[in-house]
Regions:
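Short amphipathic alpha-helix that is part of the acyltransferase structural core
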Residues: 1-24, 41, 125, 137
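A short helix-loop-beta-strand connector motif used in the catalytic cores of GNAT acetyltransferases and
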Residues: 23-33, 52
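Conserved beta-hairpin
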Residues: 29-43
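Conserved acetyl-CoA binding element of GNAT-fold acetyltransferases
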Residues: 49-60
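Conserved acetyl-CoA-binding loop-helix of GNAT-fold acetyltransferases
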Residues: 58, 64-77, 104
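Conserved GNAT acetyl-CoA-binding A-motif
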Residues: 79-93
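Conserved catalytic-core motifs of GNAT/GCN5-like acyltransferases
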Residues: 90, 108-124
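Conserved active-site alpha-helix within GNAT-family acetyltransferase domains
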Residues: 93-111
Protein backbone atom coordinates (compact mmCIF):
# COMPACT_ATOMS: atom_id res chain seq x y z
CA UNK A 1 0.00 0.00 0.00
CA UNK A 2 1.16 3.52 -0.83
CA UNK A 3 0.23 7.03 0.30
CA UNK A 4 0.16 9.69 -2.42
CA UNK A 5 -0.67 13.40 -2.64
CA UNK A 6 -3.01 14.27 -5.48
CA UNK A 7 -1.21 15.59 -8.54
CA UNK A 8 -1.77 15.51 -12.30
CA UNK A 9 0.38 12.39 -12.76
CA UNK A 10 -1.58 10.41 -10.17
CA UNK A 11 -4.90 11.78 -11.47
CA UNK A 12 -4.00 10.32 -14.88
CA UNK A 13 -3.09 7.00 -13.25
CA UNK A 14 -6.54 6.90 -11.61
CA UNK A 15 -8.22 7.63 -14.94
CA UNK A 16 -6.32 4.83 -16.66
CA UNK A 17 -7.43 2.37 -14.00
CA UNK A 18 -11.06 3.40 -14.45
CA UNK A 19 -11.48 4.07 -10.73
CA UNK A 20 -12.09 7.80 -11.09
CA UNK A 21 -14.67 7.13 -13.79
CA UNK A 22 -16.67 5.08 -11.27
CA UNK A 23 -16.09 7.63 -8.51
CA UNK A 24 -15.29 11.14 -9.77
CA UNK A 25 -14.68 12.47 -6.26
CA UNK A 26 -11.41 10.52 -6.08
CA UNK A 27 -9.86 13.14 -8.37
CA UNK A 28 -10.71 15.85 -5.82
CA UNK A 29 -9.01 14.18 -2.86
CA UNK A 30 -6.07 15.75 -1.06
CA UNK A 31 -4.24 12.44 -0.60
CA UNK A 32 -4.73 8.71 -1.14
CA UNK A 33 -3.95 5.30 0.17
CA UNK A 34 -3.77 3.05 -2.87
CA UNK A 35 -2.75 -0.39 -4.03
CA UNK A 36 -1.45 -1.29 -7.45
CA UNK A 37 -0.50 -4.34 -9.44
CA UNK A 38 1.90 -4.08 -12.38
CA UNK A 39 1.87 -0.26 -12.06
CA UNK A 40 -1.95 -0.26 -12.40
CA UNK A 41 -4.10 1.14 -9.57
CA UNK A 42 -6.58 -1.55 -8.43
CA UNK A 43 -7.98 0.28 -5.40
CA UNK A 44 -7.81 3.71 -3.81
CA UNK A 45 -9.16 5.42 -0.72
CA UNK A 46 -8.97 9.19 -0.76
CA UNK A 47 -9.63 12.01 1.65
CA UNK A 48 -10.61 15.63 1.09
CA UNK A 49 -13.07 18.45 1.65
CA UNK A 50 -13.79 20.62 4.66
CA UNK A 51 -15.47 17.67 6.40
CA UNK A 52 -12.53 15.33 5.64
CA UNK A 53 -14.73 12.99 3.61
CA UNK A 54 -13.27 9.60 2.83
CA UNK A 55 -14.07 7.89 -0.45
CA UNK A 56 -13.06 4.43 -1.58
CA UNK A 57 -13.18 2.58 -4.88
CA UNK A 58 -11.86 -0.88 -5.72
CA UNK A 59 -11.92 -2.61 -9.07
CA UNK A 60 -14.53 -5.36 -9.05
CA UNK A 61 -12.18 -8.34 -9.34
CA UNK A 62 -10.28 -7.08 -6.26
CA UNK A 63 -13.34 -6.75 -4.02
CA UNK A 64 -13.96 -9.11 -1.11
CA UNK A 65 -10.24 -9.66 -0.43
CA UNK A 66 -9.74 -7.23 2.45
CA UNK A 67 -8.26 -4.48 0.28
CA UNK A 68 -10.93 -1.94 1.28
CA UNK A 69 -10.16 -2.35 4.96
CA UNK A 70 -6.42 -2.15 4.30
CA UNK A 71 -6.80 1.07 2.29
CA UNK A 72 -9.24 2.66 4.73
CA UNK A 73 -6.91 1.77 7.65
CA UNK A 74 -4.01 3.35 5.78
CA UNK A 75 -6.05 6.48 5.22
CA UNK A 76 -7.02 6.66 8.91
CA UNK A 77 -3.39 6.23 10.01
CA UNK A 78 -2.20 8.91 7.59
CA UNK A 79 -4.96 11.29 8.75
CA UNK A 80 -3.82 10.80 12.35
CA UNK A 81 -0.19 11.51 11.36
CA UNK A 82 -1.37 14.70 9.66
CA UNK A 83 -3.19 15.76 12.84
CA UNK A 84 -6.74 15.45 11.54
CA UNK A 85 -9.40 15.65 14.26
CA UNK A 86 -11.96 13.47 12.47
CA UNK A 87 -12.94 11.76 9.20
CA UNK A 88 -16.40 11.33 7.72
CA UNK A 89 -17.83 8.96 5.15
CA UNK A 90 -21.10 8.73 3.22
CA UNK A 91 -22.09 5.08 3.08
CA UNK A 92 -25.08 3.32 1.51
CA UNK A 93 -26.46 1.26 4.43
CA UNK A 94 -27.57 -1.41 1.93
CA UNK A 95 -23.90 -2.06 1.08
CA UNK A 96 -23.37 -4.58 3.88
CA UNK A 97 -19.64 -5.14 3.21
CA UNK A 98 -18.88 -1.41 3.33
CA UNK A 99 -21.09 -0.98 6.39
CA UNK A 100 -19.25 -3.75 8.28
CA UNK A 101 -15.83 -2.48 7.24
CA UNK A 102 -16.44 1.12 8.31
CA UNK A 103 -18.03 0.05 11.60
CA UNK A 104 -15.10 -2.28 12.37
CA UNK A 105 -12.69 0.63 11.90
CA UNK A 106 -14.54 2.77 14.43
CA UNK A 107 -16.85 4.90 12.28
CA UNK A 108 -20.14 5.77 14.01
CA UNK A 109 -23.33 6.62 12.14
CA UNK A 110 -24.57 10.14 12.94
CA UNK A 111 -27.59 10.42 10.64
CA UNK A 112 -29.20 8.93 7.53
CA UNK A 113 -30.20 10.85 4.40
CA UNK A 114 -32.96 9.53 2.10
CA UNK A 115 -32.14 11.79 -0.87
CA UNK A 116 -34.75 10.05 -3.01
CA UNK A 117 -36.61 6.76 -3.27
CA UNK A 118 -33.44 4.99 -4.46
CA UNK A 119 -30.56 6.94 -2.89
CA UNK A 120 -29.85 6.53 0.82
CA UNK A 121 -26.65 7.40 2.67
CA UNK A 122 -25.54 7.07 6.26
CA UNK A 123 -23.18 9.83 7.35
CA UNK A 124 -20.52 8.33 9.60
CA UNK A 125 -17.70 9.89 11.60
CA UNK A 126 -14.56 8.69 13.31
CA UNK A 127 -13.20 11.12 15.91
CA UNK A 128 -9.52 11.48 16.86
CA UNK A 129 -9.42 14.75 18.83
CA UNK A 130 -11.61 17.25 20.74
CA UNK A 131 -12.34 19.31 17.62
CA UNK A 132 -13.77 16.13 16.09
CA UNK A 133 -16.17 15.78 19.02
CA UNK A 134 -17.36 19.35 18.37
CA UNK A 135 -17.91 18.63 14.65
CA UNK A 136 -19.80 15.44 15.53
CA UNK A 137 -22.12 17.42 17.82
CA UNK A 138 -22.82 19.92 15.03
CA UNK A 139 -23.56 17.14 12.52
CA UNK A 140 -25.90 15.43 15.00
CA UNK A 141 -28.27 18.38 14.45
CA UNK A 142 -29.27 16.63 11.21
CA UNK A 143 -30.48 13.57 13.14
CA UNK A 144 -33.93 15.14 13.56
CA UNK A 145 -36.77 15.99 11.17
CA UNK A 146 -36.10 19.71 11.55
CA UNK A 147 -32.38 19.15 10.99
CA UNK A 148 -33.12 17.02 7.92
CA UNK A 149 -35.36 19.79 6.55
CA UNK A 150 -32.53 22.29 7.02
CA UNK A 151 -30.05 19.91 5.37
CA UNK A 152 -32.42 19.29 2.46
CA UNK A 153 -32.79 23.02 1.85
CA UNK A 154 -29.03 23.53 2.13
CA UNK A 155 -28.29 20.74 -0.35
CA UNK A 156 -30.99 21.82 -2.79
CA UNK A 157 -30.18 25.52 -2.84
CA UNK A 158 -26.45 25.60 -2.06
CA UNK A 159 -25.18 22.86 -4.38
CA UNK A 160 -22.22 24.95 -5.56
CA UNK A 161 -20.84 25.12 -1.98
CA UNK A 162 -21.06 21.40 -1.26
CA UNK A 163 -18.15 20.17 -3.42
CA UNK A 164 -15.68 22.05 -1.21
CA UNK A 165 -17.30 20.80 1.96
CA UNK A 166 -17.89 17.16 1.15
CA UNK A 167 -15.47 16.41 -1.69
CA UNK A 168 -18.02 15.43 -4.33
CA UNK A 169 -18.22 17.32 -7.59
CA UNK A 170 -21.53 19.15 -8.02
CA UNK A 171 -22.87 16.63 -10.55
CA UNK A 172 -22.19 13.74 -8.12
CA UNK A 173 -24.23 15.23 -5.29
CA UNK A 174 -27.61 13.50 -5.41
CA UNK A 175 -30.56 15.78 -6.21
CA UNK A 176 -32.53 15.73 -2.97
CA UNK A 177 -36.26 15.38 -2.62
CA UNK A 178 -36.88 17.39 0.55
CA UNK A 179 -40.27 15.73 0.94
CA UNK A 180 -38.67 12.29 0.73
CA UNK A 181 -35.93 13.30 3.18
CA UNK A 182 -38.58 14.29 5.74
CA UNK A 183 -41.13 11.50 5.21
CA UNK A 184 -38.49 8.75 5.19
CA UNK A 185 -36.50 10.24 8.09
CA UNK A 186 -35.07 7.63 10.48
CA UNK A 187 -33.60 8.70 13.81
CA UNK A 188 -30.22 7.04 14.39
Amino acid sequence: MYIQEMNSKFREKLRKSGLSKEMKSLESCDFFAFEEEDNFVVGAAGLGGLFHVSGIQILEKWRGKGLGKKLQSGLINEAKKRNYSFLTVFNDPRNIASEKMHNSLGYKTIFRIHYSKDIVNDVKIIVFKKRGIFIKKILEIFNSKVGMLILGILIKYSRKLFPRMILYSEENIPEPSIMNMITKFEKI
